UniProtKB/Swiss-Prot annotation:
Residues of the PDZ domain: 329-414
Native source organism of the sequence: Drosophila grimshawi (Hawaiian fruit fly)
EC number of the protein: 3.4.21.108
Membrane topology type: Single-pass membrane protein
Region listing for Serine protease, in residue ranges: 143-306
Membrane-spanning ranges: 71-87
Record field: compositional bias (Low complexity): 31-58
Catalytic residues in the record: 161 (charge relay system), 193 (charge relay system), 270 (charge relay system)
A GO CC annotation given for this chain: mitochondrial membrane
Lineage of the species this protein comes from: Eukaryota, Metazoa, Ecdysozoa, Arthropoda, Hexapoda
Protein name: Serine protease HTRA2, mitochondrial
Domain of life: Eukaryota
């Protein structure tokens, strides 16, 4: 910037100072010429003219240098000043930024919630004891989910579908600090989709249980868990509805008013806590329909399950086996009610307008019969063995029929396909 200023100054001086210097020099030349002429005209004036010429020449020289100095000095000083100012402008912004104070502390309320309760959230892996990794020799992971510690002595709450319906498997729990422990299934309620696990460790961080009955629509909530096996993941949103009846979701055998939220929940979040801004669990993440529509089991209902489970443990009649009574297919599904169908059709172009019933395959467990048979997440089952499938109960009835194979008609996008699945016996 300083070099540019000096260059511009030199150009300016050449353009505007030249006439002044020329005038000074020209006047000096004229005086010399006149003096020479006078000298030639008469010798009697030689001494006088010579004296005058010397004086005039000295005066003209003084006049020329004084004019040049008077003209150049201000511009030189101006150039120096402009270069300094220009240099300062490069170092300082033209508009000073407003200083913001305490914004991070005042508005990072989500981070405060996470800091208060994240240590109690765990990652749950289901290991297939029949298949082993080629390099490590360890059982491969068949599925995964989330949970959270509710007692210091190692009691963990999660979803039932995370830990059951998987024969020849073992359950493994990883804590937030990275420690891993084998877990045993202690109690299961398939109707409410809740289960408890136990790991042999004490002094664990415990999640506080809040009240779901005091929630309001629009209230901020935080979902914690391990979506897609990415443990310690946090998403935030609001409560969309506090009273979403199970009948609206096609879950006819359940009497639960689910919490609906727009917090991002996906595979692996199941069983994790839905937390309010006080760091209290107000729900258990259970299922997702589509982006922005997910559901959690309200914590007030969960407390009833925990009370019944504690009573069964005292009587010695708690859940003993990790295996289901029903044949195993390896999917998590959701009934497509009219409301859910309307939402799906409004959010995606990849669904036939004529579709009026079916079951949405939400998750397919790797290595399961459904996975081997070709089912994929997002498929919609409309028929099994030539019978219409209108809700998840129809799928369970088909499993109980005793037929070896299930011939399914599915929709994958707008394309109709057929797949055959052979469920495993318990």
């Amino acid at each position: 910037m300083a070099l540019r200023s000096i260059t511009k100054l030199e150009t300016f001086l050449k353009r505007y100072s030249a006439p002044t210097l020329y005038y000074c020099l020209h006047r000096s030349t004229q005086s010399s010429t006149c003096n020479s002429t006078n000298t030639d005209n008469g010798s009697h004036n030689t001494n006088y003219n010579s004296s005058n010429n010397n004086n005039n020449n000295n005066d003209n020289k003084r006049f020329s240098w004084r004019s040049a100095i008077r003209f150049l000095v201000p511009f030189s000083l101006g150039a120096l000043a402009s270069s300094v100012v220009a240099g300062d402008r490069e170092l300082m912004p033209t508009i000073s930024a407003k200083t913001l104070t305490n914004n991070r502390r005042d508005f990072n309320f989500i981070a405060d919630v996470v800091a208060s309760c994240a240590d109690s959230v765990v990652y749950i892996e289901i290991k297939d004891t029949r298949h082993f990794d080629y390099f490590s020799g360890q059982p491969i992971t068949a599925s995964n989910g989330s949970g959270f510690v509710i007692e210091q002595n190692g009691l963990i709450l999660t979803n039932a579908h995370v830990v059951i319906n998987k024969p020849n498997t073992m359950v493994q729990v990883r804590l937030s600090d990275g420690r891993t422990f084998p877990a045993t299934i202690e109690d299961v309620d398939q109707t409410s989709d809740l289960a408890t696990l136990r790991i042999q460790v004490t002094n664990l961080s415990v999640m506080k249980l809040g009240k779901s009955s005091t929630l309001r629509s629009g209230e901020w909530v935080v979902a914690l868990g391990s979506p897609l096996a990415l443990s310690n993941t946090v998403t935030a949103g609001v409560i969309s509805s506090t009273q979403r009846a199970s009948q609206e979701l096609g879950l006819r055998n359940r009497d639960i008013n689910y919490l609906q939220t727009d917090a991002a929940i996906t595979f692996g979040n199941s069983g994790g806590p839905l937390v309010n801004l006080d760091g209290e669990a107000i729900g258990v993440n259970s299922m997702k329909v589509t982006a922005g529509i997910s559901f959690a089991i309200p914590i007030d209902y969960v407390k009833l399950f925990l009370e019944r489970a504690a009573a069964r443990r005292k009587k010695g009649s708690a859940y003993k086996t990790g295996y289901p009574v029903k044949r195993y297919m390896g999917i998590t599904m959701l009934t497509l009610t009219p409301d859910i169908l309307f939402e799906l059709k409004s959010r995606t172009q990849n669904m036939p307008e004529t579709l009026s019933h079916g079951v949405l395959v939400w998750k397919v467990i790797v290595g399961s019969p459904a996975h081997s048979g070709g089912l994929q997440p997002g498929d919609i089952v409309t028929h099994i063995n030539k019978k219409e499938i209108k809700n998840s109960s129809d799928v369970y009835d088909a499993l109980a029929d005793g037929k070896k194979d299930l011939d399914m008609v599915i929709l994958r996008g707008v394309k109709q396909m057929r797949v055959t699945i052979t469920p495993e016996d318990p």
